[in-house]
């Protein structure tokens, strides 16, 4: 079994609902410039150009007839999370991974989940620019997180029907963002994105950090 297969099966082992979905190692081949969700879809490493940093986060995703599945394997020597979780706002000061979905690149409407190392979530909807509704949440998203020797793994799934109802055209294309916040013991933070930009400071609520995605 390849290293990439081991990674996704470690994440899948956290979920009974992942079942026996088989995945193989490899990079997503793309489709007319799109990131194609398939058994080999992967993003190996995120970027913080504003801090001149890259990390070793491995993001993988695949789908079946009902759900879109995703996992992050994060290398982090200082996992930062709250022992006393008092609600979704707690996630704002923790290490976390983030996934954004938007029907259009303009981000007229977009939907976000920010997930800490233990699988606890802050989810919300937004309208460009930063018109956020923290009262909104995914109905079908299921999440789990687990600390590892080298950091943590987060895995999740969301119903494809829910994504469609949110306006995402899964087969013909929608926009997705993959991000990470890495807090340190002094509470400084590095912000990582799958898409590297020329910005001098991080801002994930803008179209430039999203990438075009299709689900086969």
Where are the language model's segments positioned?
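Accessible peptide chain termini
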Residues: 1-2, 29
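Bacterial N-terminal signal peptides that target proteins for export
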Residues: 2-12
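Bacterial N-terminal signal peptides
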Residues: 10-20
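Structural preference for beta-rich elements and adjacent junctions enriched in aromatics
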Residues: 25-216
